C-alpha cells in the first residue's frame, strides 16, 4: 500500500506533506469558485430581472444558474419567447454583466464602450423604445450600427455623433462620412 511505503522513508513523508498541502489549496479554490459563482449568479439574476422588467412589455421571471445559464419563463413556467423577446433577454444579459462590472471595484473608473450591430431589427416598437431608453445606462458610450434612421427613436440628448457608411454597390467600395446622409 502506498501510504505504508511512503511513510517508511523521509522522502516519502515530504511527498505526502506536499500532496496534503496541494489538496488543501485545491479545496480552498473549489470552495471559493463555488461561493463566488453563487454570489455572482445571484447578482446577475437581479440585474437581468430589473432590466427585463424595464424593457419587456410582458412579465417574465429570470433564473441564472451557477454556470451563468439564463432561463426566462412566463407565469406558466414556459420558456418559449418571440424573436423580439429573445433579443430583449440578450440585451438584459449584456446590461446585467455591464452593471456588475460597473459595481466591481477592479473595474471602477474604467470606461468600455458597448458596440451593437443592428440591435433593433427584431423588436416591436414598444420593446425597441424600452431598450433604447435603457441603453444609456449600460455603458458611458454606446455605438450603434443600424441601417435604419434612429433619430425618431433615440433622443438627440443621447446622440453624440452620427457617421454614415456610404457604399458604391457597383465597385463594392465604401467610405465613412460624418453626418446623417440618408433620406
Locations of regions flagged by a protein language model:
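Eukaryotic, compositionally biased intrinsically disordered regions
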Residues: 59, 67-69, 120-123, 133, ...
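Conserved catalytic network of the ASCE P-loop NTPase/AAA+ motor domain
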Residues: 81, 104-108, 134-138
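Conserved ABC ATPase signature
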Residues: 37-41, 70-98, 119-125
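Extended, charged coiled-coil "arm/hinge" scaffolds of SMC/Rad50-like chromosome-maintenance ATPases
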Residues: 1-71, 102-107
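Walker B catalytic motif
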Residues: 111-119
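C-terminal lobe/lid and adjacent interdomain/linker elements of RecA-like ASCE P-loop ATPase modules
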Residues: 126-183
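Hydrophobic, well-ordered secondary-structure elements that form the walls
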Residues: 52, 89, 117, 142
Amino acid at each position: 500500500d502506498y501510504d505504508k511505503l511512503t511513510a517508511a522513508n523521509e522522502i516519502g513523508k515530504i511527498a505526502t506533506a506536499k500532496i496534503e498541502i496541494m489538496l488543501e489549496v485545491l479545496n480552498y479554490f473549489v470552495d471559493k469558485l463555488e461561493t463566488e459563482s453563487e454570489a455572482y449568479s445571484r447578482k446577475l439574476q437581479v440585474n437581468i430581472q430589473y432590466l427585463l422588467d424595464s424593457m419587456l412589455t410582458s412579465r417574465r421571471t429570470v433564473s441564472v444558474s451557477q454556470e451563468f445559464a439564463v432561463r426566462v419563463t412566463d407565469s406558466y413556467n414556459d420558456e418559449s419567447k418571440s424573436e423580439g423577446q429573445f433579443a430583449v433577454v440578450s440585451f438584459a444579459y449584456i446590461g446585467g454583466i455591464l452593471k456588475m462590472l460597473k459595481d466591481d471595484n477592479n473595474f471602477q473608473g474604467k470606461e468600455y464602450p458597448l458596440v451593437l450591430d443592428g440591435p433593433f431589427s427584431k423588436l416591436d416598437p414598444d420593446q425597441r423604445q424600452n431598450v433604447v431608453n435603457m441603453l444609456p445606462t449600460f455603458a458611458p458610450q454606446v455605438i450603434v450600427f443600424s441601417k435604419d434612421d434612429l433619430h425618431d427613436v433615440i433622443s438627440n440628448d443621447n446622440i453624440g455623433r452620427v457617421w454614415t457608411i456610404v457604399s458604391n454597390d457597383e465597385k463594392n467600395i465604401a467610405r465613412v462620412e460624418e453626418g446623417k446622409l440618408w433620406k
